Amino acid sequence: MKRTFQPSNIKRKRSHGFRTRMATKNGRNVLARRRAKGRSSLSA
């Protein structure tokens, strides 16, 4: 049986990257929450 997690940096960046987050209002909300929480890394 094939495992569910098949890592790919391109897919990772496209779905969870900074520019993808900035592209939508909800994505910007995510970044704002992570900044407020004090995350050292905001996005993938």
From Swiss-Prot:
Q: Where is this region: Disordered?
A: 1-44
InterPro entries per the UniProt record, alphabetical: Ribosomal_bL34, Ribosomal_bL34_CS
Bias-annotated ranges (Basic residues): 10-19
Show the PROSITE patterns listed in the entry: RIBOSOMAL_L34 (PS00784)
According to UniProt, the name of this protein is: Large ribosomal subunit protein bL34
Highest lineage ranks of the organism?
A: Bacteria, Pseudomonadati, Pseudomonadota, Gammaproteobacteria, Alteromonadales
Extract one GO molecular function annotation from the record: structural constituent of ribosome
* Annotated disulfide bonds: none
Q: Does the UniProt entry include the keyword Metal-binding? A: no
Q: Which family does it belong to?
A: Belongs to the bacterial ribosomal protein bL34 family.
Q: Which PANTHER family match?
A: LARGE RIBOSOMAL SUBUNIT PROTEIN BL34M (PTHR14503:SF4), MITOCHONDRIAL RIBOSOMAL PROTEIN 34 FAMILY MEMBER (PTHR14503)
What keywords appear on the UniProt entry?
Answer: Ribonucleoprotein, Ribosomal protein
Example GO biological process term?
translation
- Tell me any Pfam family this protein matches: Ribosomal_L34
